[in-house]
Swiss-Prot record:
It is a multi-pass membrane protein. Transmembrane segments: none annotated. The lineage of its organism: Bacteria, Pseudomonadati, Chlamydiota, Chlamydiia, Chlamydiales. Belongs to the chlamydial porin (CP) (TC 1.B.2) family. The keyword Calcium does not apply. One of its GO terms (cellular component) is cell outer membrane. This is Major outer membrane porin. In elementary bodies (EBs, the infectious stage, which is able to survive outside the host cell) provides the structural integrity of the outer envelope through disulfide cross-links with the small cysteine-rich protein and the large cysteine-rich periplasmic protein. It has been described in publications as the Sarkosyl-insoluble COMC (Chlamydia outer membrane complex), and serves as the functional equivalent of peptidoglycan.
Length: 402
C-alpha cells in the first residue's frame, strides 16, 4: 500500500508539472515540515508533553509567494434581457426609425451565457504564517496582482447606433438617440494595472499515519486593480483607451451624455475591477526523505466585478474633416453615398458606440492540484504546484522558519 501511494503521488507531481494549468491548495503537511528554526531551535510539537509551554507551541514562518494563473475558466454574469436600446433595424433600405424610443420589454442579452476566451491573473507577495503545535497554520500574504482578460465583443455588450438620419455627428438630435445594434463579431481585451492584493487562510493536518498526511485548507483573497488599457476591435468600431473612465449606476443608462467619449465628459468613474475569491481544499501528501509530493482537490469561487461600468468610444467634441471618430462607412449594396438633402450623412456610420464591462465569475468550481515540497535541514522549504480543470495555473512558495 505504501509503495502504491508513493508511486501515485510521484507520478502526479512530475507528470502534471509538464502541463501547467487562483489560489494554491498547498502541501497539507506544510505546518509540520519545518520543525527547526534558523534563529530559534525548534521545540516539541506535542501538546500532550507535560513539559511543553505555549511558547513552544507557537512558531513563525516567512517567505515568498508567487501564483500565476494562465487561463481561469470564467463566464459573464448578466441578466437574460438587456434594456434601454432602440428596436433593431429590419427594413431593407432607408433609415432606422424610432431610434429615440427604447424597446418596451428590452431584448435578449447578447452577453448572456458568454464565456471568457482568456483570463490571466498573476500575483507576487510576501508570505507570513503563524504555526501552532506544528499542526496548524494561520497565514496571510501581502503583495501585488495584475490581470488580462479577453472575449468576444458580445460578452461586453458592444453597442451603437446605425441608420440614423442627421446632418452632422454633432447634431442636436443625436443626444436623444439610443443605440439600436449589438456588435457580436469583434474582440474586447483589457489589461489591469499592478495593484495591491492580500489574502488570508488557514491550513491544518487532519490525519497522519507514518509518512502520509491528510490536510485541509481555507483561503480568501482580494484585490482592486484598475483597467490600464482597453482594446476594442470590430469592423464597425475600433478603438484603444489608456486608463479608461466610464459611467456607473443610473448615469450609465441610455442615452449617454453627448459629451461621452470626449475630453469634456463629466461624472465619469475609473474602471476598477473588484476581485474576490474564496477556496476550500483537501490534499494528501507522503514524505520521501527531503521530498514531499502531494495531490489535492479544491472548491473555489472567484468574481471580477467592475460595477457594469459603461465606457464610450473616444471621439472629438466637434467635427474635423466631417468626422468625430475613425469608424468606417458601411455602404452595403448602394453605389453612392446617402444624401437625402444632406440629412443622411451619418446613416452608414456607427454612432455613440460604447461597451459595458460585465461581471465575470467562475464557470467551473472544482479543480485538482498536484505539487511537491523540497525541504532542507527542516528549516527551509520550496514548494511547486500545478492546478488543472477550473484553471491552468502554477504556484511557487519559498519559506523559512524563524
Amino acid at each position: 500500500m505504501k509503495k502504491l501511494l508513493k508511486s501515485a503521488l510521484l507520478f502526479a507531481a512530475t507528470g502534471s508539472a509538464l502541463s501547467l494549468q487562483a489560489l494554491p491548495v498547498g502541501n497539507p503537511a506544510e505546518p509540520s515540515l519545518l520543525i527547526d528554526g534558523t534563529m530559534w531551535e525548534g521545540a516539541s510539537g506535542d501538546p500532550c508533553d507535560p513539559c511543553a509551554t505555549w511558547c513552544d507551541a507557537i512558531s513563525i514562518r516567512a517567505g515568498y509567494y508567487g501564483d500565476y494563473v494562465f487561463d481561469r475558466v470564467l463566464k459573464v454574469d448578466v441578466n437574460k434581457t438587456f434594456s434601454g436600446m432602440a428596436a433593431t433595424p429590419t427594413q431593407a433600405t432607408g433609415n432606422a426609425s424610432n431610434t429615440n424610443q427604447p424597446e418596451a420589454n428590452g431584448r435578449p442579452n447578447i452577453a448572456y451565457g458568454r464565456h471568457m476566451q482568456d483570463a490571466e491573473w498573476f500575483s507576487n507577495a510576501a508570505f507570513l504564517a503563524l504555526n501552532i503545535w506544528d499542526r496548524f497554520d494561520i497565514f496571510c500574504t501581502l503583495g501585488a496582482s495584475n490581470g488580462y482578460f479577453k472575449s468576444s465583443s458580445a460578452a461586453f455588450n458592444l453597442v451603437g447606433l446605425i441608420g440614423f438620419s442627421a446632418t452632422s455627428s454633432t447634431s442636436t438630435e443625436l443626444p436623444m438617440q439610443l443605440p439600436n445594434v449589438g456588435i457580436t463579431q469583434g474582440v474586447v481585451e483589457f489589461y489591469t494595472d499592478t495593484s495591491f492584493s492580500w489574502s488570508v487562510g488557514a491550513r491544518g493536518a487532519l490525519w497522519e499515519c507514518g509518512c502520509a498526511t491528510l490536510g485541509a485548507e481555507f483561503q480568501y483573497a482580494q484585490s482592486n486593480p484598475k483597467i490600464e488599457v482597453l482594446n476594442v476591435t470590430s469592423s464597425p468600431a475600433q478603438f484603444v483607451i489608456h486608463k479608461p473612465r466610464g459611467y456607473k449606476g443610473a448615469s450609465s443608462n441610455f442615452p449617454l451624455p453627448i459629451t461621452a467619449g470626449t475630453t469634456e465628459a463629466t461624472d465619469t468613474k475609473s474602471a476598477t475591477i473588484k476581485y474576490h475569491e474564496w477556496q476550500v481544499g483537501l490534499a494528501l501528501s507522503y514524505r520521501l526523505n527531503m521530498l514531499v509530493p502531494y495531490i489535492g482537490v479544491n472548491w473555489s469561487r472567484a468574481t471580477f466585478d467592475a460595477d457594469t461600468i459603461r465606457i464610450a468610444q473616444p471621439k472629438l467634441k466637434s467635427e474635423i474633416l466631417n468626422i468625430t471618430t475613425w469608424n468606417p462607412s458601411l455602404l452595403g449594396s448602394t453605389t453612392t453615398l446617402p444624401n437625402n438633402g444632406g440629412k443622411d450623412v451619418l446613416s452608414d456610420v456607427l454612432q455613440i458606440a460604447s461597451i459595458q464591462i460585465n461581471k465575470m465569475k467562475s464557470r467551473k468550481a472544482c479543480g485538482v492540484a498536484v505539487g511537491a515540497t523540497l525541504i532542507d535541514a527542516d528549516k527551509w522549504s520550496i514548494t511547486g504546484e500545478a492546478r488543472l480543470i477550473n484553471e491552468r495555473a502554477a504556484h511557487m512558495n519559498a519559506q523559512f522558519r524563524f
